[in-house]
Structure formats: C-alpha cells, structure tokens
C-alpha cells in the first residue's frame, strides 16, 4: 500500500455511505492520532485498538444523526506521497467556512488546523473532513 492515510479515509468514507456502525483499519501511530482528532472534534463516536498477532487494528465507531445520516459528509486527502502540500500558520485552510476540519502534521505532532493556528505552527496538510 502506497498511501495508508488515504486508505483509512476511504474505509471511513465507504463505511459511512453504507451506514455501517463500525469500521476496522490497520493501526499505525499516524492513524491513531487522526482518529483521536476525529473523536475530539465530534466526527466519530469512539475508537478502540484491538491487539492482534500480525498487527493491531483500530476499530472506529461511526457517528450518525438521529435520522441516520452520517456526521462525516466528506473526507479529502490533500498531501499525497507524490505531491506533499505544506502550509505556513497564516495560510492554514478553513474547510467549508469553518464547519469542517483540516488535519495537519506539524513538528509538535498531528493536530487540527485551528490547534496549529493557536500554537503558531504550520506543517503538512494531511486531509480535510467535513
């Protein structure tokens, strides 16, 4: 697999469209950090890490509105292995007029765009969530 983060976003997108309750994703530190941000910002209900022999797995519990519409309506991978996208603090993008979220990989770790702006750091724009 060339882009594990894109794979994670695609699995979440497909599970939301199919109205699944949970989705399983192979674990890594970066994916765990992204899942923590999605939970903290209210886009997913919860996540757990299941220990496994060959590899640990992240099980994400998706969040839906009372009328069974997914809270996550869109996910977009921005910086890709073939074309990295970096941004300064002043240029951190707002997603959907502030209704969405940008996730950045900074020297201080993976964080949401508004957190990076508050901490005055820029970094690699991993993805947008809305």
Swiss-Prot record:
The UniProt entry, under InterPro entries, shows: Ribosomal_uS8 (IPR000630), Ribosomal_uS8_sf (IPR035987)
A Pfam family hit: Ribosomal_S8
An annotated GO cellular component: ribonucleoprotein complex
The GO terms this record gives for MF are: rRNA binding; structural constituent of ribosome
**Record bears the keyword Metal-binding:** no
Q: Which GO terms describe its biological process?
A: translation
Instruction: Look up the domain of life of the source.
Output: Bacteria
* Record carries keyword rRNA-binding: yes
What keyword terms does UniProt attach to this protein?
Ribonucleoprotein, Ribosomal protein, RNA-binding, rRNA-binding
Role, per record? One of the primary rRNA binding proteins, it binds directly to 16S rRNA central domain where it helps coordinate assembly of the platform of the 30S subunit.
Q: How does it assemble?
A: Part of the 30S ribosomal subunit. Contacts proteins S5 and S12.
Question: What family name appears in the similarity comment?
Answer: Belongs to the universal ribosomal protein uS8 family.
- The name this protein carries in UniProt is Small ribosomal subunit protein uS8
Coding gene?
A: rpsH
